[in-house]
Amino acid sequence: MFSPARPTMVLGSSQPAEAVDHAACERAGVDIVRRRSGGGAVLVIPDEMIWVDVVIPRRDPHWDDDVGRAMHWIGEAWRQAIDPRALRVHDGRLVTQALAAQVCFAGRGPGEVILESSPTTKVVGISQRRTAGWARFQTMVHRRWQPVLMADLLTERPDERQLADAVGVVERPEPDLLAALVRHLTAPPT
């Protein structure tokens, strides 16, 4: 589990640096960094999200050579930990829209967790890095979402309502949520 020390705008691997308003980030006290995975930006703010990375070796029973299918088990663990009745794991291909090029949570990828009642609302974002010997799954859940701040920090200001609807917030107490997640992550594959 990671806890950011400062508010940070994390650019996706293919996102141009110009997508973010650097002056607005500086005024807001938001650092800018780039990750090696994903498409759109992610706004990471201390105490407003839960960021959990899981690394498995190739010999792990959860390993799948199919990169898309490989994320389903971790999405299912998050779904079970949060609320299995209200959520589902996206089992299709990557679904993007114009907003997803700017904001990671506006798209849906294989294994990501979305609201059953609103399939455009992402609750758990997942990205993956892998080598021949291991896979690292980077996951994030929002405990609070600030769509206006996110819009303010982007060069091309997106519609705030679309941003607000793109992200589902998890209000379950963090210790309980993490304990449930660990239980589901360590359960044998079915």
Mark where each language-model region is.
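N-terminal lobe of the biotin/lipoate ligase/transferase fold
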Residues: M1-G68
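Extracellular structured ligand-interaction cores
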Residues: R6-T8, P110, Q138
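Short, structured patches in soluble enzyme cores that scaffold and shape functional sites
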Residues: S13-Q15, V54-R58, W78, S127, ...
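Short acidic-glycine loop/turn motifs at beta-strand connectors
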Residues: P46, L115-P119, T131-A132
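Internal, conserved structured core segments that host functional sites
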Residues: D47-P110, S118
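Long, positively charged amphipathic alpha-helical accessory segments at protein N-termini or as interdomain linkers
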Residues: G75-V103, Q128-T190
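A translation/RNA-centric and nucleic-acid-associated enzymatic feature enriched
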Residues: V124
